[in-house]
Regions:
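Residues that flank catalytic or metal-binding motifs in active/ligand-binding sites
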Residues: 30, 43, 74, 109-111, ...
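Local sequence-structure signature of Cys/Sec-based thiol-disulfide redox active-site neighborhoods
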Residues: 37-82
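Intrinsically disordered, low-complexity Pro/Gly/Ser/Thr-rich segments with frequent PxxP/GP/PP motifs
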Residues: 1-4
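Generic low-polarity alpha-helical segments
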Residues: 9-11, 34, 113, 120
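Enriched for extracellular/lumenal, surface-exposed ectodomains of secreted and cell-surface proteins
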Residues: 9-24
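Short, conserved sequence motifs used for protein processing/export or organelle targeting and
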Residues: 80-227
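Short beta-strand elements
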Residues: 23-43
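A short linear-motif detector with a strong N-terminal bias
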Residues: 11, 57-58, 162-167
């Protein structure tokens, strides 16, 4: 097909192994609906890490995450929350809400990670898991197999003089969605921050550090509230 959308596809099997002696042809045809995505659609996977400056095991966890992500062929968006361990100079007010995704929000740990905020029951009952090479690869692979239900086009313009950020969002649904039950948020992250880190020295480079949300809250705003 040369167009996108949900279409009915019919498949017919005949001339199996070069033969034409199928007596019963009543079961040779199958039809069903298949959704065809745009040719230029790019899938992004959200990988959120949990870390802390006082966490001595976190530099090793960062290395494991970096290795898995660098060797992945997927388009990955990485965010590092300074939460799950003791709060530090990079912990933001929104970070505490994301402890909700731990197996036990009152007993958290770091280094930790979650992918697309979804749990894999074969690994853990909760989205957040301890960083492990094999499990992180599995979560990314399964996230890549999931069906995306919308395409997002984000256009940003930053005014250096006014220090103002303007954001234009276009949302194209690929299936029926309920606007009053879907939330939208924009994260601000900062790279290459030099600062102290337990087991990493006084000039450790912190990457993908979560610095807050444009919406001003942890969970975002309803699509119906966007103008």
């Amino acid at each position: 097909t040369d167009s996108e959308g949900e279409k009915n596809v019919e498949v017919e099997i005949f001339n199996v192994n070069g033969g034409n002696n199928d007596i019963d042809t009543s079961d040779n045809t199958f039809s069903g609906n298949i959704f065809f995505y745009p040719n230029n659609m790019e899938r992004s996977i959200l990988v959120e890490g949990f870390t802390g400056q006082d966490c001595s095991n976190c530099p090793g966890g960062h290395l494991t995450m970096n290795s898995v992500i660098e060797n992945s062929t997927e388009n990955i968006v990485e965010v590092s929350h300074h939460a799950g361990y003791y709060p530090d100079m990079y912990t933001m007010k929104e970070d505490g809400a994301y402890l909700f995704y731990y197996p036990n929000p009152s007993s958290t740990f770091a280094p930790a990670v979650m992918v697309n905020r979804k749990a894999d029951q074969d690994i853990s009952s909760a989205p957040v898991i301890a960083i492990d090479n094999k499990n992180l690869k599995t979560l990314i692979t399964k996230a890549a197999e999931s069906k995306p239900y919308v395409s997002l086009n984000l256009d940003t313009k930053f005014d250096d003089a006014k220090r103002e950020l303007k954001i234009k969002l276009q949302i194209k649904p690929h299936e029926q969605i309920t606007a009053d039950s879907v939330l939208f948020n924009v994260f601000l992250t900062q790279d290459n921050i030099q600062g102290p880190q337990s087991n990493g020295g006084s000039e450790y480079i912190h990457h993908h550090v979560f610095r807050g949300t444009v919406t001003g809250n942890s969970w975002g705003i309803l699509l119906t509230d966007l103008t």
